[in-house]
């Protein structure tokens, strides 16, 4: 079984539409999106997409500002929550599936 992973929900919805136009079963073609847009969430709820990824903008913004402030002060970012090293600060994402999609709608 294959999986189609896309960079965003809009691309995933395009894949859903193309699959439908070509009479491909979405049941056997898991389609994954990113951004948890309204359209993507609706597609997950309708079992057209297997999942979408919610990326918390507030958490990403806070982490970016904290890192920027430390860098301006020439301080280490390694101790920030989610810091992998002096280059990356990871902010957790959340997978949205048919089991939890109602929490995001």
Describe each PLM feature range.
Residues 62-105:
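Hinge/cleft segment of the Venus flytrap/periplasmic-binding protein
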Residues 28, 48-49, 92:
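A generic structural signal for alpha->beta connector loops
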Residues 1-42:
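Hydrophobic alpha-helical
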Residues 9, 55-58, 62:
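Electropositive phosphate-/nucleotide-binding environments in soluble metabolic enzymes
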Residues 35, 56, 99:
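Residues at the C-termini of beta-strands that transition into short coil/loop
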Residues 16-24, 45-49, 66-73:
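Sec-exported extracytoplasmic/periplasmic mature domains
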Residues 46-58:
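Short beta-strand elements at the ligand-binding edges of bilobed clamshell
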Residues 3, 28, 52, 79-81, ...:
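Short, hydrophobic secondary-structure boundary micro-motifs
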């Amino acid at each position: 079984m294959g999986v189609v992973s896309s960079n965003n929900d809009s691309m995933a919805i395009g894949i859903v539409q193309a699959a439908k136009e070509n009479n491909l079963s979405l049941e056997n073609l898991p389609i994954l999106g990113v951004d948890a847009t309204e359209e993507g969430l609706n597609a997950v709820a309708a079992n057209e997409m297997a999942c979408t990824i919610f990326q918390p903008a507030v958490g990403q913004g806070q982490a970016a500002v904290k890192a920027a402030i430390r860098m301006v002060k020439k301080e280490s970012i390694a101790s920030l929550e989610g810091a992998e090293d002096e280059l990356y600060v990871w902010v957790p994402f959340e997978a949205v599936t048919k089991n939890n999609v109602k929490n995001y709608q």
